[in-house]
Curated annotation (Swiss-Prot):
It comes from Prochlorococcus marinus (strain MIT 9312). One of its GO terms (cellular component) is ribosome. The lineage of its organism: Bacteria, Bacillati, Cyanobacteriota, Cyanophyceae, Synechococcales. Coiled coil: none annotated. One of the primary rRNA binding proteins, it binds directly to 16S rRNA central domain where it helps coordinate assembly of the platform of the 30S subunit. Part of the 30S ribosomal subunit. Contacts proteins S5 and S12. This is Small ribosomal subunit protein uS8. Pfam families: Ribosomal_S8 (PF00410). GO terms for molecular function: rRNA binding; structural constituent of ribosome. InterPro entries: Ribosomal_uS8, Ribosomal_uS8_CS, Ribosomal_uS8_sf.
Length: 133
């Protein structure tokens, strides 16, 4: 079965693993998935990224973060914004602040995948991939 939207698949795998309190989750490897994972790590939502394999058989293993003794997930929600059937683009002024700045919007720009904060600092807009909080 082919996967028409690998970003949605990645977000769903992370969301499901987080809800079940798994320590790691595996996602199919791609440049876009790796870029999104690096933004999530930089923003403190995941703790570690490991790559396995090469080419079309590559996989990315993400180590999820939890807080407190009850292992409360760091990622509370992940929402896909721009979809294959309806792309959402925003300029610098139109970039959203997720939960008043507590969450992160992941943006695909001409300078790579980055958080909304980094895109605002650099003064560029792009495609809003997802919201994470």
């Amino acid at each position: 079965m082919s996967n028409h939207d690998p970003i949605s698949d990645m977000l769903t795998r992370i969301r499901n693993a987080s809800q079940k309190k798994h320590t790691t989750t595996t996602i199919p490897g791609s440049k876009m998935s790796l870029s999104i994972a690096k933004v999530l790590q930089k923003e403190g939502f995941i703790s570690d990224i490991n790559e396995e394999g090469e080419g079309y058989k590559s996989q990315i293993i993400l180590s999820l973060k939890y807080s407190g003794k009850n292992k409360f997930p760091t990622i509370r929600s992940m929402q896909r914004v721009s979809k294959p059937g309806l792309r959402i683009y925003k300029n610098t002024r139109g970039l959203p602040k997720v939960l008043g700045g507590l969450g992160v919007a992941i943006i695909s720009t001409s300078k790579g995948v980055m958080s909304d904060r980094d895109a605002r600092k650099q003064g560029i807009g792009g495609e809003v991939l997802c919201y994470v909080y």
